Each structure stands twice: as structure tokens, then as C-alpha cells.
Design a protein with these regions (language model features):
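Conserved hydrophobic/aromatic "anchor" residues
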Residues: 14, 34, 48, 68, ...
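Short coil loop/turn residues that delineate tetratricopeptide repeat
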Residues: 9, 43, 77, 110, ...
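Structural signature of tandem alpha-helical TPR/SEL1-like repeats
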Residues: 23-36, 57-70, 89-103, 124-137, ...
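Alpha-helical protein-protein interaction modules
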Residues: 160, 164-167, 174-271
Length: 271
């Protein structure tokens, strides 16, 4: 029994030393101490937890997850263990996913879904350039799949690259003629580039699929306002306001596409 107590005491000493080293930023040395602590006391939940924290700092996410789960298995009723695992997942989930997708691609470079999902994850992580690169690779590997093209177009729209988005969306609508969102996005891109007739044609395709969509009706109003077709703009704006006045009114406050109608009595009455 005394030998077991000695092992636990020695384990705690190594654990404490590991914490001090980790606080100083000496992560490799801290890892060694936590591993010694675990060798002396494999049931030390806090040693596994501390080991996981250092693995996460070193971006060894799989090792970190394993250590957190061991800690949780040792103390399933520990609120701290659950909390620390949740913190790890919330802080590192995207980086962890990126790392795993990259590993999948290293093992199988021509894996279109891995490139697609890596691109989407890069986008979620705020890395648009990396996202565009991976989505383009997914398109090259699976040119008949409209989904990565639409996702790439969405990124390009967010970046203000409407011309490139138009190219992708034309392919999406060719591959998937009943894709309402693609026709709507294509209309938005054409309108942003000043191609009003093309925008109207795209919106009409969308309208044939879902005529009462609020965003479609609103964008038609915006198109006609820019185009100088005031009567059509007001007609569609009234329809949009009838569907959801609060939402449409909030859109109008920050939408420069209706500047041509400002000062018009009928328009001002609608705002």
C-alpha cells in the first residue's frame, strides 16, 4: 500500500512539474513530465487531462482527443473533465477537421469529397484563398458535380468576384436546371455587374421554380430599381413587404440598390 502511495505521490510531483513547464512554454519537457506521471499512476485523470492540453497546444489534435477521452473515462462524473473536452472541441474543431482532411488527401490525393470538405472547412475558418484552391481541385476531380461549383461561386460572391461566380453558376444551372438557389445567385451576380436583362432572365428561371420566395421578389425589386423601371420596382417591393415587412424594411436601410428611388413619394411611404 505504501508503495502505491509513493507512486501516486511521485506521479503528482511529475504532474506539478509538467504544469510549471507548460506555463513557461516548454511543451516538450512538459509532455515528458506528464507521461512520467501517467506511467507512475495510469489512473490519474488530471495527468491525462494536462497531457491533452499540451498536445492541443502542439496541434497534435488526435493525441489530444485520445488523452481527453481517457481522462473522461477515468472520471466520468467529473464536470471539469467534460468542460475541458468541450473547450478543446470548441476551440480546435475546425483545425482538427482540417488536419484530418489533409491526412485523407495525403493518403488519397484524388479524393474529391475530401478536397470539397476541406475547402468548406477552410471557408468556415476564414481562409478563403485556401478554400477556393480546394474547391477548384474538387471541381477538377468531379466536373459533373454542381455542388462544389455552387460553393465556389458563393465564396467568389462574398469576395465581390461576380464575374468568376457567373462562370461557375452558369455551369451549375446547366448541370442542375432545377436549382432555384443557383438561378437566384446568378441573377444577383448579373445585377451586380450591370447586366440587367441577363439578371431578369435568371430571376425568371428562379421564379418558375419558386415564385413566392421572399429573397427572389426583393431582388427583382432591387434589379428594377437599378434598371430605372420604377413601377416594376415598387410593385415587387410591395409584394416583398407584404410577406415580411420587418425583414424587408431592415434590408432596405442598408441596400444601395434602391438609391434611384430615394425621394420618390411612393417609395418613401413604403420604408
Amino acid at each position: 500500500m505504501s508503495r502505491e502511495k509513493d507512486s501516486i505521490a511521485s506521479s503528482d510531483e511529475h504532474n506539478s512539474r509538467g504544469i510549471e513547464l507548460a506555463d513557461r512554454g516548454w511543451l516538450d519537457e512538459a509532455l515528458k513530465e506528464f507521461k512520467k506521471a501517467i506511467d507512475l499512476d495510469p489512473n490519474s485523470s488530471h495527468a491525462h487531462d494536462n497531457l491533452a492540453t499540451v498536445f492541443a497546444e502542439k496541434k497534435q489534435f488526435r493525441d489530444a482527443l485520445d488523452a481527453y477521452l481517457v481522462s473522461l473515462r477515468l472520471e466520468p462524473d467529473s464536470a471539469t473533465a467534460h468542460y475541458n473536452l468541450a473547450c478543446f472541441l470548441s476551440a480546435h474543431a475546425l483545425d482538427f477537421a482540417i488536419s484530418e482532411y489533409q491526412t485523407a488527401i495525403e493518403l488519397e490525393p484524388d479524393y474529391p469529397d475530401a478536397h470539397l470538405n476541406l475547402g468548406l472547412t477552410y471557408a468556415d475558418a476564414g481562409k478563403p484563398e485556401d478554400a477556393v484552391k480546394e474547391l477548384k481541385t474538387a471541381i477538377e476531380l468531379e466536373p459533373s458535380d454542381p455542388f462544389p461549383r455552387h460553393e465556389l461561386a458563393g465564396l467568389q460572391m462574398d469576395e465581390g468576384d461576380y464575374r468568376s461566380a457567373i462562370t461557375q453558376l452558369k455551369d451549375v444551372t446547366r448541370l442542375e436546371p432545377d436549382n432555384f438557389e443557383a438561378w437566384l445567385d446568378l441573377g444577383i451576380c448579373y445585377a451586380q455587374k450591370g447586366f440587367y436583362a441577363e439578371a431578369e432572365r435568371a430571376y425568371e428561371k428562379a421564379k418558375a421554380l419558386k415564385s413566392d420566395d421572399l429573397l427572389l421578389v426583393y431582388n427583382l425589386a432591387a434589379l428594377y430599381a437599378q434598371w430605372g423601371r420604377k413601377a416594376d420596382a415598387l410593385e415587387h417591393l410591395k409584394l416583398a413587404l407584404k410577406v415580411d415587412r420587418v425583414k424587408v424594411s431592415s434590408w432596405l436601410k442598408a441596400d444601395p440598390m434602391f438609391e434611384a428611388l430615394e425621394g420618390e413619394a411612393e417609395f418613401e411611404a413604403l420604408r
